[in-house]
Amino acid sequence: MNILVTGIHGFVGSNLVVALKERHSLYGLDIVAPEKEGVVKTFFWKDIEPASFPMRNLPEFDAIIHLAGKAHDTKNRSAAQSYFDINTGLTQKIFDFFLESSAKKFVFFSSVKAAADSVVGDMLTEDVVPAPVGPYGESKIAAENYILDKLKVENGKLK
């Protein structure tokens, strides 16, 4: 499979490359584009902008794994808008790119912070009503909602 991985130079992306490189052709999409062992090519974010780099110049992808994002800032030094620009805005761009592409699979890594800031009891379950606290969690749930709003539901399943 040809797989495009966003955030390929981050912690999860770097480890995912190690796990997938033997069986798949991996491409990266990141804010930096140095060569990386196991990756055919890494593109910059601007490369998926149709006006500056038409999609016909990109390889065809079978799947897109979206890991890129702005991590929560435990020291609270980041401006709130930067979370929305990156976590929500870039997710919108990459999901729209996916919808226009030939890829059949899209995997989005969000965050537990999209659902809750803390867990009452032993675990957080899927039936929790999202109540994010702060711009990090709010930007992640906004990205999730954007994707869900774009999807079709058929016979109770997301398509």
What are these regions (language model features)?
Residues 6, 29, 64-68, 106-111:
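SDR active-site strand-loop-helix element
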Residues 32-40:
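Short loop/helix-cap segments at secondary-structure boundaries that form the rim of catalytic
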Residues 3-23:
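N-terminal Rossmann NAD(P)H-binding glycine-rich loop of SDR-like oxidoreductase domains
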Residues 45-86, 97-100:
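NAD(P)H-binding glycine-rich loop region in Rossmannoid oxidoreductase-like domains
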